[in-house]
Amino acid sequence: MKWLGRAVFWLITLVIIFIVATALVVQTSWGTKQISALISDNTRYKVSLSAISHSLSSPSLISLSDISISTVSGDFALEAANVELTLDWRSFSEPGWFARIIVQKGDIEISDAADSGTLPVSAGLLQLNQTTVRRTDGNRVIDAEGVTGGITPWQPQGSDLTGNGKYQFSANSLNYYGLPLKNILTQGEVSGKQFTFDNLTATLENGLLTATGRRSAEGQWQLDNLLLNDIRWQTPQSLTQLADSTEGLPDIQAKNITATNIKLEGHQWAVNYLEGTVKNLAFKQGRWQTDNGQADIAVADLTLSEQHFSDIISTLELRGDQIAVNRLTGRYDKSILRFTGDWNRATRTLNITSGVADNLLYSFPEQWFSALQESAPQGIDTIRLQDIKVSNALLIDTQPVFPFQLTNVNGYIKTIQILKSGQWGLWDGELSVSAGNATFNRVELHRPYLTLTAGADSAATTQFAASAGEGLLKMQFQTTLSGTAPFSFTLQATGADSQILSQWGWQPAPLTGSANYTLRLDGQLRAADIRSTLNGMLSGQDKQGNQINRAITQGQMSNTPVFAEPVPSAPPAQRVIPDNGEIK
């Protein structure tokens, strides 16, 4: 039987020699090229590598240098300076299994079509060192650079590329659906397409982001805690564009969000030093959803277009489609503002249930009246005001056609609707306004005051008067708020300067000094050119007996006198406004 022993010995020796020879050949440049060509020609993978290294001192370790692997379908690609494969006994019974896979200085691209069959490989540990990972999902890209870390074990299953295991990774940068993160560190567990992160920290726009939570298999982010600190974020987008862009973000559900010292800036808007907490709030397709959401937010400075607000404090409750504004305070210039109310998203209705404006200084924007003739911006249909108090306000309009200014303005709105079905107007309520002094196109008025009552389809003044020098002006205004909003206006002047109307753009009257006169007009408030719709009459008489009776047609005063009833001589003007300025 000695011959059998010798045969076995020589057979084993030949096998070892063959293995060693094969290993030596494979490690040559010629052998490496042959293996690359063999795989590329007979599988769905395109493979190239510069060298295969193996050492008898580390028999379980195989090193692949300058390796490139990609699928013909394009759903996976890997390029790396070096890939180390560590074998164990399981590798011989399960092809494709490795005790450890290390990818160094690599670049990995994965599409949403990739699955466990894309690269039938698994490992006890998958480790990445300074690797770039890029995943495409339709038109959206997740891009991570400088990734270092690992997942154990790594066993892709079905459409899942990660399997079940624990992970810990760091990355120099991560672009997640346009959100630029840097210096990322995270750890947690992964189960299929769902993973949890026990800790996630990152730098966001020079600030700090810290979070704990999970991502569901459906792609929804569930955040237990999210902390944002010292973030400085800029965008070229307007608020409208920014809101539209959120529709493409993945769904987010947050139990608790805390923000401190945040600065945000975009096109014609800026938020400085935002702090606050938000609880139990979800965003799905750019829309918030909650049944018991709460928000406490403070902002040191807020700029919207050219309007600047400061020291804003708000307390909100969110239920279904409704936001209850339990508290909203702030400053506008030197004024103090306080409001409560609610917003209903389903009906697009804003109710301001109480409000106070003290020492308000407000300059009307250009074309403000034209804006009121147009429909309101999309997204809001109704605005109702209740219990609104204004004290010691200053209102200014500097447009050159008809500038005006009102000082020491005081007003009260018991209830009124100012927006209905997207149209501006006054419905269903009453208001009163008074001012210490006013100037309308260089005509000074003293103690003007107005009370107005509005119904379902019309509005009218019940009191409307002011002193002008030694004279008195009484006015009446009534409008129907449907269609072109036809209106009627009457001005009765008693002992007033006869040239007031010429200061207001009308043809000079043939009257001198103080006079009694009446101006009656009918027109359409929603016309593009209101003056061209004006029709009416001007009649009056001064102290010298000079009279005027002129018709007004399409905004032009006739030079030809018309028949009118004699204007009665009025008694000397009496001040009907008390010195204390109270409205009677």
Sequence positions of predicted segments:
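N-terminal Sec-pathway targeting helices
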Residues: 1-17
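Terminal hydrophobic membrane-targeting helix
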Residues: 19-114, 179-181, 195, 207, ...
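Fold-core signature of tandem repeat domains
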Residues: 147, 174, 195-204, 209, ...
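Conserved positions within tandem-repeat grammars
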Residues: 179, 200, 300-302, 307, ...
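A structural feature that tracks compact, well-ordered secondary-structure segments
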Residues: 186, 198-201, 212-214, 314, ...
